[in-house]
Amino acid sequence: MTKINENVAIQFVKGENEKDQPEIRLFRNLDGKKGKAVYKFYKPKTITLTNYKSVQRMFLIDSEGVLSTKKIDLSISEDHVKEVKSTYNWNSEEEFERFMRFASRYANSLSQN
């Protein structure tokens, strides 16, 4: 299992870094200002059947601070959380650049371990 740098993390439960590595897809409008990143976690570790109702945000944490989104969809089976899909939106070039700095740090933290 890949160890994630503690300074860069994704959290659904405050204080608990998600260990599952997401699939991430980026979408941008033609004008380049608005867009979104769609995260899919196929085996989330921090979201369980006992705490999934309390999960309300995805937090993207790095040295600059915290980005967050409330757009979270869960796929649940009888005995576990199967998939988490979360969407982070940006509405300006500055917000996109900030997101990309987080994404770069997150990717680098995974490749260093």
Swiss-Prot record:
One of its GO terms (cellular component) is plasma membrane-derived thylakoid membrane. Disulfide bonds: none annotated. The keyword Transmembrane does not apply. InterPro entries: Psb28_c1_sf, PSII_Psb28_class-1. It is found in: Cellular thylakoid membrane. GO terms for biological process: photosynthesis. Keywords: Membrane, Photosynthesis, Photosystem II, Thylakoid. It is a peripheral membrane protein. Belongs to the Psb28 family. HAMAP family: PSII_Psb28 (MF_01370). Part of the photosystem II complex. This is Photosystem II reaction center Psb28 protein. It comes from Prochlorococcus marinus (strain NATL2A). The lineage of its organism: Bacteria, Bacillati, Cyanobacteriota, Cyanophyceae, Synechococcales.
